[in-house]
Amino acid sequence: LGMDPTAIGRVNATMDSVLMGHLYAKAAIDVACWDATGKSYGVRICDLLGGAVRERVPSYHGVLIASPEGSAADAARHQEEGFPRIQLKVGGRSVEEDIAAIRAVAAVLRPGVRLAADANRAWTTSAAIQVSQACRDIPMVLEQPCASYRENASLVGKVAHPIYLDESAVDLATVVAAIGEGVADGFGMKVSRVGGISAMRAVRDVCAAARRPHTVDDTWGGDLAAAASLH
């Protein structure tokens, strides 16, 4: 690009002017610009973003698809390691199996340890409603229960739990729409998917203004993506 990496806003505007989309590719450049800017001023990226609000960041553990007993054992083990949130993978099997796994995991969690049932788009709307209503006594959130934004929107008022969007939360515009339309109670955000730290900062501020919680992590990118998410 031949540009000053500390002019992060102009770098992003230039990329957007010559190439639509491709946010994963742009994210790498955006994160590199933030890194270069922080180093040039001798400060951390989090300080550029307004200052660190904590020195230790709570995380969550993902429990993969397994038997109810296996899922419960995994959740209990990582609860003892100090994880304050357990994300249980569901979907891709019968509704009855998902319900059994959710109940088994919920039974071993201590008060204060939060539970998310993450279908990663695997449920139909019917399955999401069945599982939620069958587990309405269990405090948890439903993360990306169905594949499309429209399907998840149709669940509002029919499920007994808050809905978090993950794969459908592809950019700031979708986050704004989901909040305004009452579709999402929270979000699972990926730094690389939305285009980098600059876009994630905007999502953070919108969620803060609307009092919507969100996670910040990434599926790919290794230590670099993890470091960007941490800041």
Language-model features, listed with the residues they occupy:
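Active-site mouth loops of central-metabolism enzymes
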Residues: 23, 55-70, 90-91, 120-124, ...
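Catalytic domains of carbohydrate-active enzymes, especially glycoside hydrolases
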Residues: 77-89
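Catalytic core of soluble alpha/beta enzymes
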Residues: 88, 93-227
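N-terminal small/glycine-rich loop or linker at the start of catalytic domains
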Residues: 16, 40-65
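Short coil/turn connectors at secondary-structure junctions
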Residues: 43-44, 54-59, 81-84, 111-112, ...
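Oxidoreductase and adenylate-handling cofactor-binding alpha/beta cores
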Residues: 229-231
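Metal- or metallocofactor-binding catalytic centers and their adjacent structured scaffolds
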Residues: 1-40
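Active-site loop-helix segments enriched in His/Asp/Glu that coordinate
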Residues: 53, 57-59, 65-77, 94-109
